[in-house]
């Protein structure tokens, strides 16, 4: 794909950066206080930079930093040689301690601006491993004829293109240090033009790659994959179609699981299942959530969007009974298997689309003391509007999108009579602009 150039003035300009946007870009107003906003990648608040325009729209412009004339004291040298091109992480130039400060600010701004709520207490930010933490992800794969090579990596800042990566320091080292070998593997395959993506996922004892292929692989290609897996200690899965088409190539039995030692729990999963990306932060997050929920031995807890049972099974070690509800029937099946494997008979699981009417379901009609929920980016407003919320003494809301959390917090506080006791950011994705957070609500 040729890189097109839109017809607008791309002359570099000098400007001062006044703020950091929610997606990690510097914010400038080119014509003074009342000027049009420009979002500038690679720039930090307090800096003076030379930027090159990259896009123009009616309400704002976009640009990239080409020279820093006056640097912020919080600026550091990015570790990654691909910073500024790859979109995998956009905050490596900001000191680590300040990254989470920026994310706290994004969270509080969203709560106030969208939800019109302010927490009584701002929770200290939760942090875990900051390098080599990413145990699940998806690489794009593209054969570039002009370069006569195959690229394997994350998308560039311009999402039309795949970054040509030599290494990735945020991905677990078993994968991040072998990206060139992965690219060479695909380049040597007969079906190199029919492989659009490679997904990776790591348990405590195994690392798996899932190869998406649009046409059947030749016997030669399958053998190349097996030899690569054996040489690098990977498990290889093939995906010729949808999620249900995934099957092992080598070996036939793969022990994919992770352990939560504090609760004596082990969670098994499949190669395309959702798991939390950052293992060290996940364990801290579970302990944090259970403490904030103030879970008691006699409590009955409802866990919505429960997935594999990441919160549900630790809760089952703590409370009298827990009910987990999840929209993905496959994850529900695995959650039940995980409960049985861990000898937990006080955890029930239900498959339900939580964006649809659930008021007549068996689980909805049960009584509970407390609610824990960990919804997708779209939030939980649909199910919150159906729940008999008055029964919950406390609600702990784990969020992967501050905007939807703010909207839902506004509903709970301004329409349902809850207080927002506390909220804080959690750095699940260091060096990215992604904001994970947690909030605690109590009935007034």
Curated annotation (Swiss-Prot):
- Role: Catalyzes the formation of 5-methyl-uridine at position 1939 (m5U1939) in 23S rRNA.
Q: Which GO BP terms sit in this record?
A: rRNA base methylation
Residues recorded as binding S-adenosyl-L-methionine, renumbered to this chain, are 276, 305, 310, 326, 353, 374
- Database matches in SUPFAM superfamilies: Nucleic acid-binding proteins, S-adenosyl-L-methionine-dependent methyltransferases
Known PROSITE patterns for this protein? SAM_MT_RNA_M5U (PS51687), TRAM (PS50926), TRMA_1 (PS01230), TRMA_2 (PS01231)
- At the top level of its lineage, which domain of life is listed? Bacteria
Catalysed reaction(s)?
Answer: uridine(1939) in 23S rRNA + S-adenosyl-L-methionine = 5-methyluridine(1939) in 23S rRNA + S-adenosyl-L-homocysteine + H(+)
Which enzyme class, named as a word? transferase
The gene from which this protein is expressed is: rlmD
UniProt domain TRAM: residue ranges: 5-67
> What is the organism field in this record?
Xanthomonas campestris pv. campestris (strain ATCC 33913 / DSM 3586 / NCPPB 528 / LMG 568 / P 25)
The UniProt keyword set, sorted, is:
4Fe-4S, Iron, Iron-sulfur, Metal-binding, Methyltransferase, rRNA processing, S-adenosyl-L-methionine, Transferase
Q: What is this protein called?
A: 23S rRNA (uracil(1939)-C(5))-methyltransferase RlmD
Q: Which residues bind [4Fe-4S] cluster?
A: 80, 86, 89, 168
A molecular function (GO) term: RNA binding
């Amino acid at each position: 794909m040729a890189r097109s150039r839109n017809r607008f003035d791309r002359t570099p300009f000098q400007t001062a950066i006044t703020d950091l946007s929610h997606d990690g870009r510097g914010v400038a107003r080119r014509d003074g206080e009342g000027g049009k906003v420009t979002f500038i990648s690679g720039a930090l608040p307090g800096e003076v930079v030379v930027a090159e325009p990259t896009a123009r729209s009616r309400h704002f412009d976009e640009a990239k930093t080409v020279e820093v004339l006056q640097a912020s004291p919080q600026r550091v040298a990015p570790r990654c040689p691909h910073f500024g091109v790859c979109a995998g992480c956009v905050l490596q130039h900001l000191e680590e301690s300040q990254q989470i400060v920026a994310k706290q600010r994004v969270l509080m701004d969203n709560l106030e601006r969208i939800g019109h709520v302010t927490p009584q207490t701002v929770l200290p930010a939760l942090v875990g491993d900051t390098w080599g933490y990413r145990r699940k992800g998806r690489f794009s794969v593209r054969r570039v004829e002009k370069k006569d090579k195959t690229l394997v990596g994350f998308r560039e800042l311009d999402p039309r293109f795949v970054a040509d990566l030599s290494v990735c320091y945020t991905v677990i080292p078993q994968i991040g240090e072998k990206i060139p070998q992965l690219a060479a593997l695909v380049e040597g395959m007969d079906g190199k033009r029919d492989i659009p993506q490679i997904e990776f996922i790591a348990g405590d004892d195994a690392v798996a790659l899932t190869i998406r292929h649009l046409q059947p692989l030749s016997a030669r290609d399958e053998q190349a994959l097996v030899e690569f897996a054996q040489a690098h200690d990977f498990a290889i899965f093939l995906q010729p179609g949808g999620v249900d088409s995934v099957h092992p190539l080598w070996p036939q039995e793969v022990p994919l699981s992770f352990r939560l030692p504090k609760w004596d729990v082990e969670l098994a999963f499949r190669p395309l299942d959702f798991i939390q990306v950052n293992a060290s932060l996940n364990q801290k997050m579970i302990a944090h959530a259970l403490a904030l929920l103030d879970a008691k031995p006699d409590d009955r807890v409802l866990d919505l969007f429960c997935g594999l049972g990441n919160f549900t099974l630790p809760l089952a070690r703590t409370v009298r009974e827990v009910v987990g509800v999840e929209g993905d029937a496959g994850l529900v099946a695995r959650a039940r298997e995980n409960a049985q494997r861990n000898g937990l008979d006080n955890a029930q699981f239900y498959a339900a689309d939580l964006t649809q009417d659930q008021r007549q379901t068996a689980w909805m009609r049960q009584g509970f003391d407390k609610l824990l929920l960990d919804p997708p980016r779209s939030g939980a407003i649909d199910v919150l509007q159906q729940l008999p919320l008055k029964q919950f003494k406390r609600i702990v809301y784990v969020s992967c999108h501050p905007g939807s959390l703010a909207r839902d917090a506004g509903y709970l506080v301004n329409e349902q009579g809850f207080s927002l006791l506390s909220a804080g950011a959690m750095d699940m994705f260091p060096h990215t602009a992604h904001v994970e957070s947690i909030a605690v609500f109590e009935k007034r």
